[in-house]
Amino acid sequence: AVTVNTGLLMDDKLAIMASASRRTADKLFAKGTYSDAWSYYFNASYSVNNDNRLEFIALGSPQFHGQNFWNNRISNYSHELAREMGVAEEDLRTEYGLDYNPRADDLQTPYTGKRAVASWRPFDGWNYRTRDQRSTVMINERNNYFHKPIVQMNWYSNLNDSMTMATSFYYSGGEGGGSGSAGSILWGDNGTRDYDATIARNMSEAQFKDGYGYQSRGVLRGSRNNQSTFGIMSKLEQDMGNGLSVTYGLDIRTAKVEHYRQ
């Protein structure tokens, strides 16, 4: 992580702070649960005069990480732990170990071809682009990718001795999604997907559909979730005296949301 702070500038009116960090991990817990993320924060504060201050803030974290499947049985990880939690013997499933991930599979034959992989670029966002794979010897069909920054301009004002106002103009949103499977994906004897067999079947048993040509029987798909919100929030507080105050509020926003698969 790197952080830069200017301190007070321009006769103690302006201060700027910026921070950025990078995090990567090949495996967090279960097989295929890697993490690849950036994060950033920027803040600029300017005192217009004794009664008015402006503040600009931007923060976000474009990230990509592999996931485990959400609906695994505890006995698939550990029979001992399952028994401690009250699972009956007849309900125990096959035990695969604590790093079990049914949606991640080690490839017997390295896959070196190009793939459509979600990647983020400034001013272009998340899109599936043809590129080298993250790994040529393992596939995890469950991946999550997001970048949903927050940008806001704040105005703090003392209107008079008894009235203050705080107003924020903001944007919140961005793009992201997750990957999964569509069609038929084969299973192996070890309780995980068999992507070697699925790739071989796609190559030998592609199905023809009118208007679409030959299609693979099992594929990886992406589910997108894009959203953007623009708004203004303002709070006016008035001191009425004798320990009594009145607060007025304004909240106006507009949002756009997209959900689709690709």
Which positions does each model-derived feature cover?
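Transmembrane beta-barrel wall of Gram-negative outer-membrane proteins
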Residues: 1-25, 29-69, 77-109, 154
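A broad, low-specificity signal for short, low-complexity segments enriched in glycine/proline
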Residues: 3-4, 13-17, 113-115, 125-128, ...
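Detector for Asparagine
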Residues: 5, 11, 43, 49-52, ...
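Short, functional N-terminal and low-complexity linear motifs
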Residues: 5-12, 23, 117-121, 133-135, ...
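Outer-membrane beta-barrel proteins
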Residues: 23-49, 68-69, 121-156, 217-231
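Sequence-level detector for tyrosine residue identity
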Residues: 34, 40-41, 46, 70, ...
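A surface-exposed, glycine/aromatic-enriched loop/edge motif typical of exported proteins
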Residues: 54-123, 172-207, 259-262
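Face-selective signature of the C-terminal outer-membrane beta-barrel domain
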Residues: 146-262
